[in-house]
Structure formats: structure tokens, C-alpha cells
From Swiss-Prot:
EC main group: ligase
Annotated keywords: ATP-binding, Cytoplasm, Ligase, Nucleotide-binding, Purine biosynthesis
Membership in a protein family: Belongs to the AIR synthase family.
Enzyme Commission identifier(s): 6.3.3.1
Protein name: Phosphoribosylformylglycinamidine cyclo-ligase
Domain of life assignment: Bacteria
Gene from which this protein is expressed: purM
Subcellular location: Cytoplasm
HAMAP family, alphabetized: AIRS (MF_00741)
CDD domains linked: PurM
Pathway: Purine metabolism; IMP biosynthesis via de novo pathway; 5-amino-1-(5-phospho-D-ribosyl)imidazole from N(2)-formyl-N(1)-(5-phospho-D-ribosyl)glycinamide: step 2/2
Length: 331
């Protein structure tokens, strides 16, 4: 008689993976979680808010996964998956509450899947949110052996009168950039076109490991800033680089004037540019060392930079806002 295992689906391996994943997920639980993993749905109690607005986001890791396949490294992309979601909802002042993941593969290997969820768990702990559920799909014949995809979904909350939507942005506001940890999770199709050997040396490390450096999670730093300062707008620098993402914080007609020499560009970007990419295209593709941008009053800028650095991240005054137009001007 034919079995599910004959078709390429190993139910026992799935049970093993779930058992391992549950341990990592449980480490993330906050007081809002009101049921255990294994139910048909995750539940989260919302209390302590006057007029709460739920803020949601979903994202994946893109073709950065291809490098993870080659390097046989699974945990860091789990952090990436969380970071891409929580940093997006953070732009509106939302505190992440809970997260769900989706993992799909051709052949499930429990230990590797658990490593991936360990990374998701680490990311959730860093962001202060709970991993309350997920789906692991074994799909034989759909993915090549050793390959998988991962996506995430998060929900956060902000008081209605505290939503940051760019409506307070004014002419003359200062733009502060917080450092990235590297390329983060965008632009990897171009990276993979230019770099073929991920074992080659780059400043004493395998370049594949450098490229797999996890996306920085800005949640703790930014939520503390919001308590102390009036933040007019925020942008997570992802696909499309400076040109696409900074204008997303503007409600009206404004131009972001960016001073290119005002912040440190990590060596990995200079290396990519040396392989034949024009500087303008770099800023339209990558974060170039700035993963998150704040728009603030000029009189608050220096204090905010000092506070960010006290929290452990480098920050720079990278430019300012000018009335008129709608885009980015690099100088």
C-alpha cells in the first residue's frame, strides 16, 4: 500500500521538527500569550491600551536564502525574517506583539528547520515579541533538495494618537541615520550575480558569512526614543535603498537632502561597487550602511544621536528635509 512517506512527506520528521521548534518558541512568550503552541490558532490578549491600533507587516528574506543554502547556515536568516517585519511596523511607532512564521521545503530536515526557528526565536526576543504560531510545509518536488523558503508575519500595537505617519514633518527637519549591520536582506540577486564563490576571503572571513550577517533589529532603541522625543517620521531602508524608502515617510511634498560623506559606508558595499556597480545604483539598491532613518526637529538631533549611541548603535546626522518635490537628493 502507498504511504505519505512514499510520496516524499515524512510525518515523523515533521513531529520531531515541531517538538524542537516548540522549545524555541516558548522562550519568546510574553504575558499577552494566553494559549500554548499546538492549538489551531495563536491567541494574544490586548490590554492596557486606551485606543489601540493594530499594525501588521509581512515579509521574507528573498534570495539571501540562496547563500544560506550554499553555506549550510540556517539560523541567521530566521533573524532576518523577524527583522524585516518588525522594523517595518516600527516605522509607525508600533510595538511588536506577536509573530508567525512560514517555512516551506522539498524535504524536511528537522534539525535544520529547528535551527531556522531558533533564529526566528532570537529575533523575536530581540524585538520583544512572541512567536505564537507558524506553518512548516513539506512539499516534495516543489523545491530542490536542500532549498526552502521562509516568510513571516507580525502584529504590533500603537495608541491611535501616537501613530507616526509623517504628518508632523516640516521644512528643515534633520534626518538621522542609524547604522546597519551590512547588506541586511535586500539586493542579493545583484550580489549573487557579482559574487560566485562564497568561500573567498574578505578581510579574514569567508565572504558568504559576511553576506549572511543578520539584519539589525531597531525595535528596542527606537521605542525608547519615542518615549523621550517627538519623532516626526521614520523609514526602514530596505529594497530600493535611499531613493525608494525615505520618501515613504513623507505625507506632503518634501525632498530628503542626503550628504553622502556624513556616514561610514561599510567595506562590503565598496567591494560590491568595485565589481562594476555605479554609485547611484548602489544607493537605489542597498542601505549603504544606514538601515533606519529618523526625521526629527533640528534642536533634538544631537541629543537623539547621543542617546542612540548610548544604546549601543552608531548614528549620524545624514541630511535634512526641504519643502517641495518628493524624493531624495544625494550630495
Amino acid at each position: 500500500m502507498a504511504t505519505y512517506k512514499d510520496a516524499g512527506v515524512n510525518i515523523e520528521e515533521g513531529y520531531k521538527a515541531v517538538s524542537l521548534m516548540k522549545n524555541y518558541a516558548a522562550k519568546t512568550f510574553t504575558k499577552g500569550v494566553i494559549n500554548d503552541l499546538g492549538s489551531f490558532a495563536g491567541m494574544f490578549e490586548l490590554s492596557g491600551y486606551k485606543t489601540p491600533v493594530l499594525v501588521s507587516g509581512t515579509d521574507g528574506v528573498g534570495t539571501k536564502l540562496k547563500i544560506a543554502f550554499d553555506m549550510k547556515k540556517y539560523d541567521t536568516v530566521g533573524i532576518d525574517c523577524v527583522a524585516m517585519c518588525v522594523n517595518d511596523i516600527l516605522c509607525h511607532g508600533a510595538k511588536p506583539l506577536f509573530f508567525l512564521d512560514y517555512i516551506a521545503c522539498g524535504k524536511l530536515e528537522a534539525e535544520n528547520a529547528a535551527d531556522l526557528v531558533r533564529g526566528v526565536s532570537d529575533g523575536c526576543i530581540d524585538a520583544g515579541c512572541s512567536l505564537i504560531g507558524g506553518e512548516t510545509a513539506e512539499m516534495p518536488g516543489f523545491y530542490k533538495e536542500g532549498e526552502y523558503d521562509v516568510a513571516g508575519f507580525c502584529v504590533g500595537v500603537v495608541e491611535k494618537d501616537e501613530i507616526i505617519d509623517g504628518s508632523k514633518i516640516e521644512n528643515g527637519d534633520v534626518l538621522i541615520g542609524i547604522e546597519s549591520t551590512g547588506i541586511h536582506s535586500n539586493g542579493y540577486s545583484l550580489v549573487r550575480k557579482l559574487i560566485k564563490d562564497f568561500n573567498e576571503d574578505f578581510n579574514g572571513e569567508k565572504i558568504g558569512n559576511v553576506l549572511l550577517t543578520p539584519t539589525k533589529i531597531y525595535v528596542k532603541t527606537v521605542l525608547e526614543l519615542i518615549k523621550k522625543y517627538n519623532i516626526h517620521g521614520m523609514a526602514h531602508i530596505t529594497g530600493g535603498g535611499f531613493y525608494e524608502n525615505i520618501p515613504r515617510m513623507f505625507k506632503g511634498d518634501f525632498t530628503a537632502v542626503i550628504n553622502k560623506g556624513s556616514f561610514k559606508v561599510p567595506e562590503i558595499f565598496n567591494h560590491i561597487m568595485s565589481l562594476g556597480v555605479e554609485e547611484e545604483h548602489m544607493y537605489n539598491t542597498f542601505n549603504m550602511g544606514i538601515g533606519y532613518v529618523l526625521c526629527v526637529k533640528e534642536e533634538d538631533a544631537e541629543n537623539i544621536i547621543r542617546y542612540i549611541e548610548k544604546m549601543g548603535s552608531k548614528a549620524y546626522k545624514i541630511g535634512h528635509v526641504e519643502a517641495g518635490g518628493h524624493g531624495v537628493c544625494l550630495k
